[in-house]
Design a protein with these regions (language model features):
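Class I S-adenosyl-L-methionine
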Residues: 168-452
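Core alpha/beta nucleotide-donor-binding catalytic domains of modification enzymes
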Residues: 30-39, 43, 47-201, 212-226, ...
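Extracellular structured ligand-interaction cores
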Residues: 35-38, 64, 154, 270-272, ...
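Polybasic, glycine- and aromatic-enriched phosphate-binding surface used to engage nucleic acids
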Residues: 407-510, 515-522, 526-528
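Intrinsic-disorder-associated, low-complexity terminal segments enriched in Asp/Asn/His/Tyr and depleted
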Residues: 4-8
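TerminUS-proximal long segments
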Residues: 519-552
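Short, positively charged and aromatic/hydrophobic N-terminal segments
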Residues: 10-13, 17-25
Length: 552
């Protein structure tokens, strides 16, 4: 008999949901069924799937099929699938994975586990959904996976169709393109591939994630989201299918709002489909639309909802990681040169601040102190940074430590800095110092008014880039981690001015709640992109608990 909450929730529970999880544990213990199959579309590196597959130590759900177009993100997805297969079916061989992570082996598998590596490649597929070949492969894989399960046993579809065209930033960019036509942008309609899978295979439940910009996006004067709701509620009608199929109720995870076939979407408060991640123990202000679709024969009254949690700050999440310095780009880099160049840059700013207006003048002694301390951090990190005493990685939250930390790792994965120009490093050091005093980032040219701080942008004083240099405030959840972090670090400046840098991939991954043993593959830019596009796994884990309870 299981009598420990950790047998259901393998990490210490979030403070506000202990009672809920205990009830859920009892419900799940009443069945001895096999793990519920999951099909994960547009999977990226696997954040949404990680949350589901880790529930109840991997016995509640099992990823049967995952699909990702990007070959580098697919490498990460496959590696994680391999880890799960080792964990669930051959735990005595987990050492193969850790030897690879710790830099003791070139490959994650040995001759004894190569079969699981190949199996992981069949589960995690690199295909383009929507293409003829991609759809044929996907359909064959889904059919094979679903045929293995006992008749009438449930299965779940998860995923988030690519969202660039929906995002507010993406739409602003498209407005600058005179030839852009929303109706011709295939990214608007990739959700119909998701819809096709719903219509063909009728999952008991689906979870669909997207940016909140989807709520206001329009094509030819019609709100896209209204059409999406109607399509998802009745996939057969949407796709003009001849056979009669199931309909779905589209449920909010944070309110009692439900959309059903025949309802008028204009009468809905669409914001009730937005999940604010920071309200649920995620150290990041990430606001996303997440739809829970429940097949009409599975629908029930009084559906469970996500439970609000205590806030987790940036410092909580990343403060326990090793301190690092940035790299000098476009010039020679060394510890001595970095200390000299950055120290001098901050000293110059300190002297200028001493004669500035009151808001900035206050910073002068703090900039002086930062300049004097700049040489105390002289490590730039590594893809595999050896663990040393003094950096425990702990967060101050037991449940988060049990979710993130892994004692089998001898290294910090993906924790390395990138290069920045010396003038940008001056801006980073200044902005982080400003934030340490005012608990906010400096805004625009009026608070970046010292010599050398203004970037060479013609419209710098227009107000368009008022938050171009944004510090992640240590005592607050971070701002949204996005794929833009792969381009530059200006929006993701570390709160410690002495480190004078942008966030590493591992720090961004922690703010997204990826476990420390989640090894992102590819070059650093590609790693950032994967992390920024993902669903926070710990949020997905809580959603998985809701789904498990509905299907229990």
């Amino acid at each position: 008999m299981v009598d420990d909450i950790h047998d259901y929730f393998p990490f210490a529970p979030l403070p506000g949901i202990l009672v809920t999880l205990l009830k859920l544990q009892k419900e799940l213990m009443s069945t001895t069924s096999l793990p519920i199959p999951i099909v994960d579309l547009f999977a990226g590196p696997g954040g949404l799937g990680e949350g589901f597959s880790s529930l109840k130590n991997g016995t509640a759900f099992q990823i049967a099929v995952s699909a990702e177009k990007d070959p580098i993100a697919h490498q990460t997805l496959r590696l994680r699938a391999f880890y799960r297969l080792l964990y669930s079916s051959r735990p005595s061989k987990l050492g193969d994975y850790y030897r690879f992570c710790n830099g003791q082996a070139e490959k994650p598998y040995s001759c004894e586990t190569e079969d699981l590596w190949h199996k992981a490649g069949k589960e995690a597929m690199c295909i383009e959904i929507g293409s003829v070949d991609g759809n044929a492969t996907l359909d064959a894989s889904i059919k094979a996976a679903l045929d293995k399960r006992p008749t009438e046993e449930p299965w779940v579809l998860i995923g988030g169709p690519p969202c660039q065209a929906y995002s507010l930033v993406g739409r602003a960019r498209n407005k600058g393109n005179a030839d852009y036509k929303a109706e011709d942008d295939h990214r608007h309609f990739l959700y119909r591939e998701y819809l096709r899978i719903i219509q063909n295979y009728q999952p008991d439940i689906f979870v669909m994630e997207n940016v909140k910009g989807i709520l206001s996006s329009t094509i030819n004067g019609k709100k896209i989201f209204h059409e999406i709701l109607k399509d998802l509620a009745n996939p057969n009608a949407a796709l003009s299918a001849e056979k009669k199929g199931q309909r779905y109720h589209i449920v909010s995870l944070v309110s009692d709002q439900v959309f059903s076939d025949g309802d008028d979407p204009s009468q809905l408060d669409l914001t009730k489909y937005i999940i604010r991640a920071e309200d649920f123990g995620i150290p990041q202000a990430r606001h996303r639309v997440i739809l829970l679709g429940i097949r009409e024969d599975r629908y029930q009254d009084k559906l469970p909802k996500l439970s609000c949690q205590n806030s987790v700050s940036v410092k909580d999440a990343i403060g326990g990681l090793p301190a690092l310095r940035s790299l000098l780009s476009k010039e020679r880099d060394s510890n001595a040169l970095w200390e000299e160049r950055v120290g001098k840059e901050l000293q110059t700013l300190a002297e200028a601040a001493s004669t500035s207006d009151d808001t900035v003048k206050i910073l002068a002694p703090y900039l002086q102190k930062t300049s004097a301390s700049i040489g105390c951090v002289l490590t730039t990190g590594s893809i595999r940074l050896p663990k040393k005493t003094g950096s425990s990685g702990q967060t101050g939250h037991d449940y988060l430590d049990k979710w993130l930390l892994d004692p089998h790792l001898n290294v910090w994965l993906n924790h390395e800095t990138r290069g920045h120009r010396i003038d940008d490093l001056g801006r980073y050091g200044y902005a982080a110092t400003f934030a340490s005093i005012y608990n906010r980032s400096p805004k625009g040219h009026k608070e970046f008014n010292l010599p050398r701080l203004a970037p060479a942008h013609k419209n710098w004083e227009s107000g368009k880039f008022s938050d171009r240099f944004r510090v992640q405030i240590k005592d607050n959840p971070s701002t949204t981690i996005t794929s833009h972090i792969s381009k530059d670090g200006h929006y993701f400046i570390h709160y410690d001015p002495v480190q004078c840098r942008s966030l590493t991939v591992r720090e961004a991954a922690r703010l997204q709640t990826f476990p420390d043993n989640y090894f992102f593959q590819g070059g650093r830019t590609q790693q950032y992109h994967q992390v920024g596009n993902a669903v926070p796994p710990l949020l997905a884990h809580q959603i998985a608990g809701i789904v498990a309870r509905i299907l229990a």
